[in-house]
Curated annotation (Swiss-Prot):
SUPFAM superfamilies: Alpha-L RNA-binding motif. One of its GO terms (molecular function) is rRNA binding. The keyword Transferase does not apply. Belongs to the universal ribosomal protein uS4 family. Part of the 30S ribosomal subunit. Contacts protein S5. The interaction surface between S4 and S5 is involved in control of translational fidelity. Keywords: Ribonucleoprotein, Ribosomal protein, RNA-binding, rRNA-binding. It comes from the Bacteria. This is Small ribosomal subunit protein uS4. The keyword Ribosomal protein applies. Residues 94-154 form the S4 RNA-binding domain.
Amino acid sequence: MSKRHSAKYKIDRRMGENLWGRPKSPVNSRSYGPGQHGQRRKSKVSDFGLQLRAKQKLKGYYGNLTEKQFSRTYEEAARRKGNTSENLIALLESRLDAIVYRAKFVPTVFAARQFVNHGHVTVNGKRVNIPSYRCKAGDVIQVREKSRNMALVLEAVASNERDFAEYVSVDAKSLSATFVRAPELSEVPYPVKMEPNLVVEFYAS
């Protein structure tokens, strides 16, 4: 198990929010950060602090991406025409592991990364094992036949914990999903408020 995977709930505690809306999140029972000093009185946060927090929260939500992975995604978003904030979200939601998570083939975004890494998914009939693989509108993502009876898949498919995203069309019988289009920020079913505009300010400062 990777350090990023094992530390997933530390991200919740550090942010003081239940990032994925999971019943097991420690934030449901306490709202302070990890460590013995978690309950200290909060001081006023600077603009830079707010921007950094917004970046850390978005990085954490997508499986605690490395700074290199996240900054590269931001740079691509900035190069594209249009609103950089919206471009950033569209790129993050176009990741193969994000779509596997949105399709509810697995219970968590961390599990989605491992699931893809271990070769359990195809894109347009070809096996792809790169979590950051960028999907395009119309791409069909499917769980490989030999992987469909895995416990975590059956658990996720049966769960009502999360809603489906409108931009991912799912066929539960064949365990396939079509990436309809890259979404706008307002369409993404985040359990908490995300502020990509502050992320843009962070990198622009």
